[in-house]
Amino acid sequence: MKLRLSIILAGMIAVFGCSHASMPVVGVSCSRSGSGSALLPTTYTDALRSAGAVPLVIPTVSDEAQAAAVMEVVDGIVFSGGEDVNPAWYGESVWNETVEIDSVRDRSDSLLARAALACGKPVLAICRGSQLMNVILGGSLYQDLPSQFSGSVAHSGKTHKIGLEEGSVLAGLYGTDSLTVNSMHHQAVKDPAPGIRITARSADGIVEAWETPQIVAVQFHPEKMLAAGDSAWLPLFKAFVSRTAQR
């Protein structure tokens, strides 16, 4: 697997190395099938293409050198949704049977996240991606909202409103103090990592978005809403792609 990934990365550098001047290349993390195949809904790549980027699905990496090689190819990275982040990463044991973990992906995403942070690549973190980045930066998660949090909002399979913080990326893009978003998660940020700015919450207080100068993180799935015909979410991806093009 290590040799195969090295060959893939070498090919990627050869193919994309001279294309950055025209279109930014944006990496996207992905899940794995039971047999180890890379899995990613096309909604992510479609959204990035619509925003003017060349999307590049990133297979799992196994060491810092591979993660660094990926960063040589991409101008930014999207951390996508998927499995739950292993609670051991934030000092807890598994809460209950609802927690589904892929330790191989956790390690890969952690390596990619740390490499992206180290070299200043713009990051868009979606759902699991938001949770992952919060953990990487020193925060923790609710492992299972239905059993750990008493809230008034249904966070799985529903839509609901979120309140936006003035001066945030989302508030600036949409010129409003609230948005309606989809919701399909059972985990969420519990203790925010030091240094991050919480920029959106649901009515019951769950973190729905946060940011740093390098990261925009959302708990909801803008790519799914865009794919369903809600073009209002394209500006979020365009703003991210614009940031990657400035590097």
Where are the model-predicted features located?
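N-terminal beta1-alpha1 cap of cysteine-dependent amidohydrolase-like domains
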Residues: 2-8, 12-126, 135-136, 142, ...
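Active-site glycine-centered loops adjacent to acidic/histidine catalytic or metal-binding residues
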Residues: 127, 185, 221
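Hydrophobic, aromatic-enriched interface-forming segments
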Residues: 130-132
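Short catalytic/ligand-gating loop segments at beta-alpha or beta-beta junctions
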Residues: 180-186, 210
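Beta-strand-turn-beta hairpins that frame and shape the catalytic cleft
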Residues: 195, 212-215
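Short, surface-exposed beta-strand/loop micro-motifs that present aromatic residues
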Residues: 206-212
